[in-house]
Amino acid sequence: MTRILGIDPGSQRTGVGIIDVDATGRVSYVHHQPLVLLGADDFPQRMKLLVLGLADLCREYEPQEVAIERVFMARNPDSALKLGQARGAAISAVVLRDLPVHEYAASEIKLAVVGRGGAEKQQVQHMVGLMLNLKIKLQADAADALAVAITHAHVRATANRLGLSARQAWGRK
């Protein structure tokens, strides 16, 4: 059994989702929560809250691998920069724990979870709930975090069947 931490980075609210995946690629729900970063006085303090929150989650749930959504180009350059910085802080937090990080674009995640790279957020939320047999409606950041973890679980399962690493199976170095 492998535990995967999925991260949907944000500068105000970061979604985290944790799943377990068995050797056959079957996924099961473990935990999800938002890391709400708005309580801090300034942006660097929000990044500190993000790093500390991820460290606490890693200590409590002991993931073995991490999957994170890649940054997309936002309309507002300042928002894109802050999102990139939040993503960097999240990656730093888990790399300091020697966890391997796997990155997926939003379109790759939607394709893996819904079957269509241009799927709507509501479709992702619905499919994640079905795949993990959840009875609650997930918020978008939680669904996205769990979706990136599920995407990595699927890539991992395919890689295992082919005798490849997850990076090789996804065509990355």
Swiss-Prot record:
Binding residues annotated for Mg(2+) 1, in chain numbering: D8, D141
Cofactor(s) this protein requires: Mg(2+)
Alphabetical GO biological process terms: DNA recombination; DNA repair
Location of the protein in the cell: Cytoplasm
Annotated positions binding Mg(2+) 2: E69
InterPro entries hit by this protein: RNaseH-like_sf (IPR012337), RNaseH_sf (IPR036397), X-over_junc_endoDNase_Mg_BS (IPR020563), X-over_junc_endoDNase_RuvC (IPR002176)
Pfam families: RuvC
Keywords annotated in UniProt: Cytoplasm, DNA damage, DNA recombination, DNA repair, DNA-binding, Endonuclease, Hydrolase, Magnesium, Metal-binding, Nuclease
Record's subunit section: Homodimer which binds Holliday junction (HJ) DNA. The HJ becomes 2-fold symmetrical on binding to RuvC with unstacked arms; it has a different conformation from HJ DNA in complex with RuvA. In the full resolvosome a probable DNA-RuvA(4)-RuvB(12)-RuvC(2) complex forms which resolves the HJ.
Active-site residues (renumbered): D8, E69, D141
The protein, known as: Crossover junction endodeoxyribonuclease RuvC
GO CC terms of this entry: cytoplasm; Holliday junction resolvase complex
Any one GO molecular function term: DNA binding
Catalytic activity: Endonucleolytic cleavage at a junction such as a reciprocal single-stranded crossover between two homologous DNA duplexes (Holliday junction)
DNA-binding found in the keyword field: yes
Function text: The RuvA-RuvB-RuvC complex processes Holliday junction (HJ) DNA during genetic recombination and DNA repair. Endonuclease that resolves HJ intermediates. Cleaves cruciform DNA by making single-stranded nicks across the HJ at symmetrical positions within the homologous arms, yielding a 5'-phosphate and a 3'-hydroxyl group; requires a central core of homology in the junction. The consensus cleavage sequence is 5'-(A/T)TT(C/G)-3'. Cleavage occurs on the 3'-side of the TT dinucleotide at the point of strand exchange.
EC number: 3.1.21.10
Comment on bound cofactor: Binds 2 Mg(2+) ion per subunit.
Family that this chain belongs to: Belongs to the RuvC family.
CDD domains (alphabetical): RuvC
Record keyword Magnesium present: yes
Organism: Stenotrophomonas maltophilia (strain K279a)
Database matches in Gene3D superfamilies: Ribonuclease H-like superfamily/Ribonuclease H
